[in-house]
Regions:
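Short loop/turn segments that flank or connect secondary-structure elements
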Residues: 1-169
Length: 169
C-alpha cells in the first residue's frame, strides 16, 4: 500500500508527546470511557443486525496482505492502550510497519479484540458487509469526533501504527 508508513515515527508531528499525554489523560476520564463503551456497544448492535460472518482468521490485522489501512483517532489509540494495559515498544511498532500488520496481532489473532478501535469493529472480510459497513463507520466516527469536541480533546485521525507511535516514542 502506497500510504502505509515505512517508519511510523517519521510521520509524528512536533507536538506528538503533548498530544499523547492529553489523549492518555482523557482516556482515563470515567465519562469518556463510558461514551466510548456506548459507541462500541451501539456499533455492536448495529453490526449484529446485519449478521456479518467473522471467521477469526486475523486477516483484518494483516493490512498489506488485504489491501487496507486502519485509521483511528488519538483518543481511540490511548483508550485501547489503557484498556489493554500494554503499549507496544518503538521496536514493535516499527516491526509491525515493516510486516505491514498490526502490532497487536498475536498468533494470528487480535490481541486487543475487546478494546479494538471503531475501524476494526467496522471491517469484515465478509463481502456482504460492503453494503453497510462504510455508512456505519462514518456514523460512529462522527460520534467520536463529537466526543473529542465535547471534552476539549485534541482531534487527530491517522494511520494506526503512526498513532501508536505517539505513545511508544
Amino acid at each position: 500500500l502506497s500510504d502505509a508508513p515505512r517508519d511510523p515515527f517519521a510521520a509524528l508531528p512536533p507536538d506528538a508527546a503533548e498530544l499523547a499525554v492529553r489523549w492518555a489523560e482523557a482516556a482515563f476520564l470515567p465519562e469518556v470511557d463510558a461514551e466510548l463503551r456506548a459507541i462500541h456497544g451501539d456499533m455492536a448492535s448495529a453490526t449484529a443486525a446485519h449478521g456479518p460472518v467473522c471467521d477469526a482468521s486475523g486477516r483484518c490485522c494483516r493490512f498489506g496482505e488485504w489491501g487496507h489501512l486502519l485509521y483511528v483517532t488519538g483518543l481511540e489509540a490511548a483508550w485501547c492502550l489503557r484498556a489493554a494495559a500494554r503499549t507496544p515498544t518503538a521496536a514493535e511498532v516499527r516491526a509491525a510497519a515493516a510486516r505491514d500488520d498490526c502490532p497487536f496481532l498475536e498468533s494470528g489473532r487480535c490481541g486487543v479484540h475487546a478494546f479494538r478501535p471503531v475501524g476494526c469493529r467496522a471491517y469484515f472480510c465478509d463481502p456482504r458487509a460492503a453494503g453497510w459497513q462504510e455508512a456505519l463507520s462514518e456514523r460512529m466516527l462522527a460520534r467520536l469526533r463529537a466526543l473529542h469536541e465535547s471534552h476539549g480533546i485534541p482531534y487527530r485521525y491517522g494511520e494506526w501504527r503512526t498513532m501508536l507511535a505517539h505513545f511508544a516514542a
